[in-house]
């Protein structure tokens, strides 16, 4: 099973992320700071990182940058309560796979996780939402994300 790191300083949000993904059989480790996650990644490997944007010390964006500069190639999904157009542009330039505003919908996050991992979507409701959304998409990734969020 794929291994996911969750980097979130708010315990309730960390729990919601882990709980929302646990039914899909992922191995999940949580960290309260990006520094802790980075130290862990120096010794181990994950398949995906889900990180808050604003963290004490190193930010989720800084962690994504370090991952891109290093030997790490796993996708990064950012969750934030502080997103704006400039932040989203910077996240995209860094190579972040997706970004979610808090509060987020768990079904859409799961869809993004499966897509980022290149895995088939096993749960029927999410699979139907992905099929409906994909059939509507003919434009940019931004339009696709909007359609996926509306479809689910």
Named regions from a protein language model:
Residues 11-29:
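Two-component/phosphorelay signaling modules centered on CheY-like receiver
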Residues 86, 104-113:
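C-terminal output helix
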Residues 8:
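Conserved acidic carboxylate
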Residues 33, 59-62:
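Acidic catalytic/metal-coordinating carboxylates
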């Amino acid at each position: 099973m794929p291994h996911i790191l969750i980097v979130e300083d708010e315990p309730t949000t960390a729990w919601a992320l882990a709980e929302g993904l646990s039914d899909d059989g992922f191995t999940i480790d949580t960290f309260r700071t990006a520094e802790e996650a980075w130290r862990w990644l120096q010794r181990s490997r994950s398949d995906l990182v889900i990180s808050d944007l604003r963290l004490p010390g190193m930010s989720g964006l800084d962690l994504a940058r370090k991952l891109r500069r290093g030997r790490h190639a796993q996708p990064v999904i950012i969750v934030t309560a502080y997103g704006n157009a400039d932040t989203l542009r910077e996240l995209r330039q860094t190579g972040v796979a997706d970004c979610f505003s808090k509060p987020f919908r768990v079904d859409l996050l799961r869809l993004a996780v499966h897509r980022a991992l290149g895995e088939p979507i096993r749960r029927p409701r999410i699979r139907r939402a992905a099929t409906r959304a994909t059939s509507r998409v003919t434009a940019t990734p931004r339009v696709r994300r909007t359609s996926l969020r509306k479809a689910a």
